Amino acid sequence: MIDVQSQKDLRGIAIQKVGIKDLNWPIVVMDRANKTQTTIAKITAAAELKGDMRGTHMSRFIEAIDELNVVGPKEIERLLDRIKEKLDSQKAYVRFDFPYFINKRTPVTETLAPLKVDCYFEAEKGEKFDLKVGVIVPVHTLCPCSKEISEYGAHNQRAYVTIEVKMRRFMWIEELVEIAESSASCPLYSILKRPDEKWVTERAYQNPRFVEDLLREVVVKISGDKRIKWYKVFVESIESIHNHNAFAYIEGENTK
């Protein structure tokens, strides 16, 4: 059969990324407590296209993805090598967005339930391999100003901490989640019985955090971790008494 994609293109315009997106695919990721965890990822995969090639072969991306076993740093790099080889490309890109579940016990009744954390792996490889790992962690914040000026109570809300890192050495997803949770007014739990709800309410009140405080607490922990060489942190507070959200952002490198 005629291979239309491989026909010559006379316009001479190279394409930086061409590929597939929003592919829902079962994957297995590493889990600190249970060794592995099965989840569903939404995958984007792309490759650089030479200026004299008319099109890419979309099915070859899926063929390369289908060879994956456990999705980790080494496996992602091998996937990018396969994409480069199958597509005759100098550079390849892939991103996995997926829900990850961490079993947590509540602070008083010790009720066990999973907490969903949205995660992503984003990687590319030309001459060098570059991998970013991201987590989006739901947490609880309580406003220090509201507490200070009020006779009783303080406005509080859910916030989301996005931590994205490039690593020198391996870190568990759970470790990044713990950094976010320990920096907030209080962690979140999927189930709260009344004694747990009391603990969470009082814990947050005793530990108020502006969005700026939360961001800085995360950065203090990340910047002191030698396993991390680069980081990006974004905190968004879903404000409960305002008709807007609040956010804070920082990006940096660990040079040591």
Swiss-Prot record:
Transmembrane segments: none annotated. It catalyses: GTP + H2O = 7,8-dihydroneopterin 3'-triphosphate + formate + H(+). GO terms for molecular function: GTP cyclohydrolase I activity. Its EC number is 3.5.4.16. Keywords: Hydrolase. The keyword Hydrolase applies. Pathway: Cofactor biosynthesis; 7,8-dihydroneopterin triphosphate biosynthesis; 7,8-dihydroneopterin triphosphate from GTP: step 1/1. InterPro entries: GTP_cyclohydrolase_FolE2 (IPR022838), GTP_cyclohydrolase_FolE2/MptA (IPR003801). The keyword Endoplasmic reticulum does not apply. It holds the Pfam family GCHY-1. The record marks 143 as: May be catalytically important. It is an enzyme of class 3 (hydrolase). One of its GO terms (biological process) is tetrahydrofolate biosynthetic process. Belongs to the GTP cyclohydrolase IV family. HAMAP family: GTP_cyclohydrol_B. Converts GTP to 7,8-dihydroneopterin triphosphate. This is GTP cyclohydrolase FolE2. The lineage of its organism: Bacteria, Bacillati, Bacillota, Bacillota incertae sedis, Caldicellulosiruptorales.
